[in-house]
């Protein structure tokens, strides 16, 4: 056994090359044991490598590499490993090889990324030996069928050739495509490179045996290429693949921005114009409202054209199909369907609100209860609680009245057809001026009803804002207009809001500053940024600054590194409100990206800024950046949640709420639990609200602590000595937990994995309730109905059932509160014992008379008890439209005997087009009527009695 390498090392000093070669071979065999001894003579080995006349110089490089590896000098080790050429075996499983390959890939990645950012002429050449090792590594991954690993390395090293090759060579091409698309959406931080990857994915998807148009369109949304989407839709209509076109339209509406959708609609309209002039088309002037009529017209045209001998292509069908697609893309269909779902399945427990109403004693909690009521009834159109408590509601004065009126907009969210009629009482009138707070609230409510789907209401709000003579009405009008025209970047709207901003009125300016951001959402409009930042630096009004702080951030929504220059300048500003704007801008620009640079910046500010508001905003903003990986958030903010600074603790609570919204994340709840007992009341408020955001729609089975928190909210609300701030948080938390009649969740990304713009905006503005309670209503933008809605070829809901393969209690509605009348009953029963005794006597007499009957009854009762003891079934059938929670989608299937087949997997949820495999007549789901005030003429008269014959005796 060798105890020293000194003898072998001495051979390196020999003149004979063969002896040196022999020494190197021996050293290579013992280097792992004697590297410390060999390291003293490593310079001799280096000299051998540098001697170009030496035959085994590559072997010298390998030994030197191993020595440097053991010394921890990985860079030198890598250089010599490259010099070893083929002697460095990438397929070897030793720790040395694994480490050097990792360093090699890191080094190669760094060079590739640096080159990618440089113009063509300035790119640095990459060492061919380095590339050779990486290529060998790729081949090893492919040979071992480690395709995901290869895709990951290919994307890191910007090797699109390898990326494409890996997908095509894999044994599961659709699976690899889905994996790559997910990586693109969640992890890729450079926009330019992401777009190149998406182009490759589009190419592969289109070249599949059966092109996957649904995923192609998801890629095209990211690429912001509405023209290509329009071309696909046009192609599908021509190929008579209408159902696929409809499905894509619904997916587009859910994932794309308003500007993108309007471009697609515009393209479809221009495509549709020649088709519209087909002779005999009777459908040109009609709005696609009454589908039955238009369908019957189509069949008539078909038969007519067939008789004359024309081809079916000449029929006027496409015009009607285009109209239907436009109706879907405009969001009209989805909003109507979601409204139907929420009205039909409304399961609000009014007892919760009644108990809260009876417990509150001041105006802040009164306002909170009104807001909580609107959350609970969001989109259900049910204003029953307000109608039952008009006297209590009338206590709201001034801005509380503004908030209460605006809450109707949340209740009637999406109820667009009758919006003006519903709100008529509260809107400004030419004749007699009403309460300014009520009128302002009414205009704000109209914006909430039409949020991100303005249409014609934008012009109405534009005129109302022009004619408003009062700053309160202008405040509501600006917010309403911003919501309705969200993301449209309309110049006339922008100019009017800018005029209102420049009036230098604090109340108007706050709303106008925020509304400017809403209208220019994600546009990165240089003029808008210049105007807003310029005015923010001039104005003396803190309120205007606050509005602009959020508005500026919204303009940079989703722009990632393009916002860096603005973020830098805002973060350096002397004004703390503008520094806070910088934090929000980071949150909006990088929302959902998980970008490490952005996280580092926010964490640095969270512990270093001198202003509490800025620190709080920085921590809150972490939630927006991490929401795609909610499991990471608790570890990032856990230390901040124990900070000595209460503002940082509050920010940590809200960050958890935002990031883990709707997930029921146990770690997040464990962090929030101690914060609900914080000595500082506003920290408790944040913890209570955040806990509701996380546990929305969770049941005791999916999240065991949900009932414990329900009781906590109730305890805080009913405790007379508790602080108003904590009570405000608890009341809002109750509203959030049971939002939308228990039928909505909060999610910052769409079902297809895109960042859901209205949700992100809604949650960001909601956090501003810290300064201004009426902004709480913005949370309604983030509520997403948890539904599966199946539609047939006519875009109607057929009667169909879905099978949920888990116990009904797993995702059941929470049990309603029991009416507390039991105690009174007990008192009464003890007071009338004599009567019960008499009743028992009578029962005994009956028993004697009807023994047989009683036996039967008892037997029946026993059967009932046995039935109750029966085990819970393992599945449940849900009727269309069905309430299906995100976690439940995994276990959702179509029953085997079902005549309908979904066009995309049920596990994605949302609105799904169903293909009918049967020729039988379909049964359709009857639409339900919305609640709310009705015009008197519309009320149905009682039906006349049935005809009868009067016989005079």
From Swiss-Prot:
What residues bear N6-acetyllysine in this entry?
310, 720
Keyword Phosphoprotein (UniProt) = yes
Q: What are the protein's UniProt keywords?
A: Acetylation, Phosphoprotein, Proteasome, Repeat
Q: Which organism is it from?
A: Pongo abelii (Sumatran orangutan)
Q: Per the record, which residues fall in region Disordered?
A: 279-318, 839-881, 930-953
Stored InterPro entries: 26S_Psome_Rpn2 (IPR016642), ARM-like (IPR011989), ARM-type_fold (IPR016024), Proteasome/cyclosome_rpt (IPR002015), PSMD1_RPN2_N (IPR048570), RPN2_C (IPR040623)
Instruction: Give a yes or no for keyword Cell membrane in this entry.
Output: no
Q: What superkingdom does the record give?
A: Eukaryota
Q: How does it assemble?
A: Component of the 19S proteasome regulatory particle complex. The 26S proteasome consists of a 20S core particle (CP) and two 19S regulatory subunits (RP). The regulatory particle is made of a lid composed of 9 subunits, a base containing 6 ATPases and few additional components including PSMD1. Interacts with ADRM1. Interacts with ZFAND1.
Give the function comment from the record.
Answer: Component of the 26S proteasome, a multiprotein complex involved in the ATP-dependent degradation of ubiquitinated proteins. This complex plays a key role in the maintenance of protein homeostasis by removing misfolded or damaged proteins, which could impair cellular functions, and by removing proteins whose functions are no longer required. Therefore, the proteasome participates in numerous cellular processes, including cell cycle progression, apoptosis, or DNA damage repair.
Basic and acidic residues: compositionally biased ranges:
290-303, 842-852, 859-872
Give residue spans, biased composition: Acidic residues. Answer: 936-953
Residue spans of the PC repeats: 403-436, 441-474, 476-510, 511-545, 547-580, 581-616, 617-649, 651-685, 686-726, 729-761
Name by which UniProt lists this protein: 26S proteasome non-ATPase regulatory subunit 1
Gene Ontology biological process terms in this record = proteasome-mediated ubiquitin-dependent protein catabolic process; regulation of protein catabolic process
Phosphothreonine modifications at: 273, 311, 830
Phosphoserine is found on: 290, 315, 834
Q: Which GO terms describe its cellular component?
A: nucleus; proteasome accessory complex; proteasome regulatory particle, base subcomplex; proteasome storage granule
| Higher taxonomy | Eukaryota, Metazoa, Chordata, Craniata, Vertebrata
Among the GO molecular function terms of this UniProt record, one is: enzyme regulator activity
| PTM sites of type N-acetylmethionine | 1
Q: Which family does it belong to?
A: Belongs to the proteasome subunit S1 family.
């Amino acid at each position: 056994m060798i105890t020293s390498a000194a003898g072998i090392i001495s051979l390196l000093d020999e003149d004979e090359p063969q002896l040196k070669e022999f020494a190197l071979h021996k050293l290579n065999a013992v280097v792992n044991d004697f590297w410390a001894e060999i390291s003293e003579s490593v310079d001799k080995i280096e000299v051998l490598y540098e001697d170009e006349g030496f035959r085994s110089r590559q072997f010298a490089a390998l030994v030197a590499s191993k020595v440097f590896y053991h010394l921890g000098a990985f860079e030198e080790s890598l250089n010599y490993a490259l010099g070893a050429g083929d002697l460095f075996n990438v397929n070897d499983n030793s720790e040395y090889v694994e480490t050097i390959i990792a360093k090699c890939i890191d080094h190669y990645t760094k060079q590739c990324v640096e080159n990618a950012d440089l113009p063509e002429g300035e790119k640095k050449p990459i060492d061919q030996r380095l590339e050779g090792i990486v290529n060998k590594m790729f081949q090893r991954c492919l040979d071992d069928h480690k395709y995901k690993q290869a895709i990951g390395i290919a994307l890191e090293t910007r090797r699109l050739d390898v990326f494409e090759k890996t997908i095509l060579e894999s044994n599961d091409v659709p699976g690899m495509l889905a994996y790559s698309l997910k990586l693109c959406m969640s992890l890729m931080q450079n926009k330019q490179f992401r777009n190149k990857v998406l182009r490759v994915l589009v190419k592969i998807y289109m070249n599949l045996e059966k092109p996957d148009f649904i995923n192609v369109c998801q890629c095209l949304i990211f690429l912001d290429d509405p023209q290509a989407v329009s071309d696909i839709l046009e192609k599908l209509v021509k190929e008579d693949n209408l159902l696929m076109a409809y499905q894509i339209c619904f997916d587009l509406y859910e994932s794309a921005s308003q500007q993108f959708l309007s471009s697609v609609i515009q393209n479809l309209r221009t495509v549709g114009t020649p088709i519209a002039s087909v002779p005999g088309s009777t459908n040109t002037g009609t709005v696609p409202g009454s589908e039955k009529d238009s369908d019957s017209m189509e069949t008539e045209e078909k038969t007519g054209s067939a008789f004359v001998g024309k081809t079916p292509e000449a029929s006027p069908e496409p015009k009607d199909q285009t109209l239907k697609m436009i109706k879907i893309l405009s969001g009209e269909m989805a909003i109507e369907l979601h409204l139907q779902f929420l009205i039909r399945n409304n399961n609000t427990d009014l007892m919760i609100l009644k108990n809260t109403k009876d417990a509150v004693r001041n105006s802040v909690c009164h306002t909170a209860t009104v807001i909580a009521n609107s959350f609970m009834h969001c989109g259900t159109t049910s204003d029953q609680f307000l109608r039952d408590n008009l006297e209590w509601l009338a206590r709201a004065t001034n801005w509380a009245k503004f908030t209460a009126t605006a809450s109707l907009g949340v209740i009637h969210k999406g109820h667009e057809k009758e919006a003006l009629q519903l709100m008529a009482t509260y809107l400004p009138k030419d004749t007699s001026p009403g309460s300014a707070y009520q009128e302002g609230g009414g205009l704000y409510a109209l914006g909430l009803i039409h949020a991100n789907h303005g249409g014609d209401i934008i012009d109405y709000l534009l005129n109302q804002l022009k004619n408003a003579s009062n700053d309160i009405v202008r405040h509501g009008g600006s917010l309403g207009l911003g919501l309705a025209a969200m993301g449209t970047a309309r110049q006339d709207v922008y100019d009017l809001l800018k005029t209102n901003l420049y009036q230098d009125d604090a109340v108007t300016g706050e709303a106008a500053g925020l509304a400017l951001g809403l209208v220019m959402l994600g546009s990165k409009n240089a003029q808008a940024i210049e105007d807003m930042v310029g005015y923010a630096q001039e104005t003396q009004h803190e309120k205007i600054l606050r509005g602009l702080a959020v508005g500026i951030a919204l303009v940079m929504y989703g722009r990632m590194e393009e916002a860096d220059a603005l973020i830098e300048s805002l973060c350096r500003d002397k004004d703390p409100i503008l520094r806070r704007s910088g934090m929000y801008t980071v949150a909006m620009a990088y929302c959902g990206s998980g970008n490490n640079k952005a996280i580092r910046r926010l964490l640095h500010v969270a512990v270093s800024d001198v202003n509490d508001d800025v620190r709080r905003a920085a921590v809150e903003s972490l939630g927006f950046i991490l929401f795609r990986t909610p499991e990471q958030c608790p570890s990032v903010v856990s230390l901040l949640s124990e900070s000595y600074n209460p503002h940082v603790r509050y920010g940590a609570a809200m960050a958890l709420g935002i990031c883990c919204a709707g997930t029921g994340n146990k770690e997040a709840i464990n962090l929030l639990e101690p914060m609900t007992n914080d000595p500082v009341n506003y920290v408790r408020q944040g913890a209570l609200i955040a806990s509701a955001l996380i546990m929305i729609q969770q049941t005791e089975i999916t999240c065991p602590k949900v009932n414990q928190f329900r009781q906590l909210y109730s305890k805080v609300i009913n405790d007379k000595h508790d602080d108003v701030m904590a009570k405000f948080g608890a009341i809002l938390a109750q509203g959030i937990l049971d939002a939308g009649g228990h039928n909505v969740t909060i999610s910052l990304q769409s079902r297809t994995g895109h960042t859901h713009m209205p949700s992100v905006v809604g949650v960001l503005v909601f956090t501003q309730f810290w300064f201004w309670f009426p902004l709480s209503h913005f949370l309604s933008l983030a509520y997403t109905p948890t539904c599966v809605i199946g539609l047939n070829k006519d875009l109607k809901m057929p009667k169909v059932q879905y099978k949920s393969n888990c116990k009904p209690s797993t995702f059941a509605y929470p049990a309603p509160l029991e009416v507390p009348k039991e105690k009174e009953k007990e008192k009464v029963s003890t007071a009338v014992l004599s009567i019960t005794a008499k009743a028992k006597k009578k029962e005994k007499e009956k028993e004697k008379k009807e023994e047989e009957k009683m036996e039967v009854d008892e037997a029946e009762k026993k059967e009932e008890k046995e039935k109750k003891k029966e085990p819970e079934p393992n599945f449940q059938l849900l009727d269309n439209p069905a309430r299906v929670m995100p976690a439940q989608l995994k276990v959702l299937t179509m029953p085997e005997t079902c005549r309908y087949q979904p066009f995309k997997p049920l596990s994605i949820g949302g609105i799904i087009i169903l293909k009918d495999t049967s020729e039988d007549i379909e049964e359709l789901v009857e639409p339900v009527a919305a609640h709310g005030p009705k015009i008197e003429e519309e009320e149905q008269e009682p039906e006349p009695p049935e005809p009868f014959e009067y016989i005079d005796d």
